[in-house]
Amino acid sequence: MLTAIRKNGLILAVFACVSTGLVALTYALTAEQIQQQEQKQLLQVLNQVIPHKYHDNPLAQACTLVNDDKLGTAKTMHAYLAQRDGQPTAIAIETIAPDGYNGEIKLIVGIANNGTVLGVRVLAHQETPGLGDKIDLRISNWVLGFNGQQVTADNQDDWKVRKDGGQFDQFTGATITPRAVVLAVKKAVEYVNQHQQQLHNQPNPCEGQ
């Protein structure tokens, strides 16, 4: 009987080892696929907010880490540094609108060296379907209204929704969400305008993060 118990114990031990190995292998393969998919999605977004004509460098690798309250959060954000023929041309920077209707709205803003907004995309949000979710390009083209805009000393009041006297449309039944996004984009542009040279001169420590 003792021999049978030992035999069963050995079988269970082998089974446990094999199962653990299979789980580890599956995780490793899945993690690699997830990482590749995330990298692909990142490149797609970066190329939307910084068009190809502005860069010939690998944007996803030309990345630096930024921490500033101007970006709406105490968390570390990513900034992607575009170059063309070895010369700085634009920056895509992550930012947070902390005061969305249902919480934080994460954005990425592409800004040319002359301060012109090249593109804005929403990376994450929890806004109400049919109302605040119109900030998402998959739902409406509202976010394209930032393209070509600049922030200057003379147009500060324009960077508001129309209900507040500005130039950006609000949504029917949802003013809080677009108001939050407009302010967040404005602050991101101001931050990049103020720190452009510093950002381009920073090392690129965030590859793979």
UniProtKB/Swiss-Prot annotation:
Cell location: Cell inner membrane
PANTHER family according to UniProt: ION-TRANSLOCATING OXIDOREDUCTASE COMPLEX SUBUNIT G (PTHR36118:SF1)
Any single Gene Ontology cellular-component annotation: oxidoreductase complex
Protein task: Part of a membrane-bound complex that couples electron transfer with translocation of ions across the membrane.
Topological category with respect to the lipid bilayer: Single-pass membrane protein
Modified residues (FMN phosphoryl threonine): 175
Assembly, per entry: The complex is composed of six subunits: RnfA, RnfB, RnfC, RnfD, RnfE and RnfG.
HAMAP family, per database record: RsxG_RnfG
Entries under NCBIfam families matching the protein: PRK01908.1, rnfG
GO MF annotation list: electron transfer activity; FMN binding; oxidoreductase activity, acting on NAD(P)H
Residue intervals passing through the bilayer: 9-29
Listed cofactors: FMN
Alphabetical UniProt keywords: Cell inner membrane, Cell membrane, Electron transport, Flavoprotein, FMN, Membrane, Phosphoprotein, Translocase, Transmembrane, Transmembrane helix, Transport
Domain of life: Bacteria
Class of this enzyme: translocase
GN (gene name): rnfG
Similarity comment: Belongs to the RnfG family.
A GO BP entry: electron transport chain
Protein's name according to its UniProt entry: Ion-translocating oxidoreductase complex subunit G
E.C. designation(s): 7.-.-.-
